[in-house]
């Protein structure tokens, strides 16, 4: 089942924990964050942060409210200024109505990495297809890569005990400013390379 299927009420504050470890590992297969400072601004229950820490990243966790996982700060990412620079910002952002909040996360993240760094957001695989988002993708010089997930994420456990059958495809979208003049074509990757791994 997907995040926002009509038969399910939207979760308060769009809290959809990325419980499956392979999702974050798919990013790490293409981005080395070992020894890097990483801000997880929608840490939720800490699932993604724990995988990043296990990979050697120094993770700073925040969220708009406390969901029980130890946070370094509590606040709205789109309004926060930590007064420091991070090597990367990595998160599964809340979508909000018509995914407007996710767009705001991209815009805010781009401001935070303006002095260098990487922004990696987990989003629906077709998020870059909307014409109104061209400024964030096709026309954005910082848009660097897309990592298409070859498995579907299970967000909820079915109460009837049956095997979940998620319907939504997702991808990691990556932005990174460089000193190159002009724009280079974004790269497309796929992960995990074995779509049946972890089953």
What is each residue range found by the language model?
Residues 1-199:
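Class I S-adenosyl-L-methionine-dependent methyltransferase catalytic core
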């Amino acid at each position: 089942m997907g995040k926002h299927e009509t038969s399910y009420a939207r979760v308060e504050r769009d809290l959809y924990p990325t419980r499956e470890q392979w999702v974050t590992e798919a990013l790490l297969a293409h981005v080395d964050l070992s020894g890097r400072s990483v801000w997880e601004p929608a840490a939720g229950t800490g699932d993604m942060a724990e995988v990043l820490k296990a990979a050697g990243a120094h993770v700073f966790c925040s969220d708009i409210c406390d969901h029980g996982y130890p946070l370094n700060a509590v606040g709205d990412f789109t309004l926060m200024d930590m007064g420091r620079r991070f090597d990367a910002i990595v998160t599964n952002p809340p979508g909000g109505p018509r995914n407007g909040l996710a767009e705001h996360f991209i815009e805010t993240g781009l401001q935070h990495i303006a002095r260098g760094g990487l922004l990696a957001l987990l989003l629906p695989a077709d998020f870059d297809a909307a014409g109104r988002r061209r400024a964030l993708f096709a026309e954005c010089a910082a848009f660097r890569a897309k990592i298409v997930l070859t498995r579907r994420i299970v967000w909820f456990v079915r109460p009837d005990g049956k095997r979940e059958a998620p319907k939504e495809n997702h991808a990691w979208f990556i932005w990174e400013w460089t000193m190159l003049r002009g724009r280079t074509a974004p790269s497309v990757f796929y992960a995990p390379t074995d779509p049946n791994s972890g089953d």
